[in-house]
Regions:
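Thioredoxin-like thiol-disulfide oxidoreductase module
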Residues: 32-51
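Generic recognition of short, well-ordered alpha-helical segments
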Residues: 15-19, 41, 67-68
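Non-catalytic, surface beta->alpha helical segment in thiol-disulfide oxidoreductase systems
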Residues: 58-79
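Short alpha-helical
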Residues: 12, 37, 64
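Local sequence-structure signature of Cys/Sec-based thiol-disulfide redox active-site neighborhoods
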Residues: 1-29
Length: 79
């Protein structure tokens, strides 16, 4: 499973999303949008209408933020 997480320091939902992924033993690639490189990657890969953080993609499909991640993981675990 390929998981990409866009996050930023000081974002409580970002911290919770990372802890959730780690508790499930899932690895992920993180881009910190608090850095210039992270901003460029975020703007290139995430639609302008989705600017809240975190933004999470699983297998190139946007699942959204923390609630979307929780729902996606429940669906994956149930299948």
């Amino acid at each position: 499973m390929n998981i990409i997480l866009y996050s930023k320091d000081g974002c409580p939902n970002c911290v919770t999303a990372k802890k959730l992924l780690e508790s499930k033993g899932l690895t992920y690639q993180e881009f910190d949008v608090g850095t210039p490189d992270g901003v460029v990657i975020f703007q290139a890969n995430v639609s302008a209408q989705h600017r809240q953080l975190p933004q999470i993609f699983i297998n190139n499909q946007r699942v959204g933020g923390l609630a979307g991640l929780q729902a996606a993981l429940k669906q994956i675990e149930g299948s």
